[in-house]
A protein has these predicted regions:
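Bacterial N-terminal signal peptides
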Residues: 8-16
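Basic polycationic patches enriched in arginine
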Residues: 6, 21-23
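Bacterial N-terminal signal peptides that target proteins for export
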Residues: 1-8
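Residue-identity detector for glycine
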Residues: 3, 16-18
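Hydrophobic small-molecule pocket/channel-lining residues, especially in calycin-type beta-barrels
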Residues: 23-178
Length: 178
């Protein structure tokens, strides 16, 4: 092999090593952590300011909701607040994703205090909906966020177990962008 042929071969080998090394580093990157940013095309539709009208145990309620990515884009923070003064209800919800377990994880902190905020919610996406399950001390609770692309609204349905173990609506809301 001539000297110029060796030089060309060496350059080709070096050029191929860069992309191969980058692919190896990507394969070795952890599934979760600060370098694995949470990207979710469905939840991206939830960012911004919303009016949130609905019913809780049959009673009409109106809230405001502000949603934005926080904590290095690892969580979508939802800030809910009753429009009444003083507010009858407030919540801060942190919705993220656990890549290792392949599920959503949710921290729901609200005006009801620590007892009900100690439970994490876990969920899955099905089409345009994310269904979360919370195993509270007094029983399981479902919260489903559903994106309605036609009218660009969200619906939120919350369900708990009633007498006899039958699932019943706890609350339902429709969100409209402000």
């Amino acid at each position: 092999m001539t000297g110029s042929a060796r030089l060309v071969l060496a350059l080709l080998l070096c050029a191929g090593a860069g992309p191969a090394r980058a692919r190896a580093q990507e394969a070795d990157a952890p599934l979760d952590g600060p370098r694995r940013i949470f990207q979710d095309s469905l939840l991206e539709h939830l960012t911004g300011d919303w009016s949130m009208a609905g019913r809780v145990r049959g009673r009409p309620v109106t809230y405001t909701l502000h949603a934005e990515w926080v904590l290095n884009h690892q969580f979508l923070e939802l800030r809910m607040r009753d429009v009444a003064e003083p507010p009858a209800y407030q919540a801060m919800v942190y919705l993220g994703y656990d890549n290792t377990s392949e599920r959503y994880v949710t921290h729901w902190l609200d005006a009801f205090g620590g007892r009900w905020s100690e439970t994490l919610g876990y969920g899955q996406r099905a089409g345009a909906a994310v269904r979360l399950v919370f195993e509270y001390p007094d029983g399981p609770f479902h919260t489903t966020f559903t994106w309605n692309p036609k009218d660009r609204t969200w619906t939120v349905l919350m369900e708990d177990r009633g007498p006899g173990g039958v699932w019943q609506e706890f609350a339902s809301y429709t969100l409209h962008h402000k």
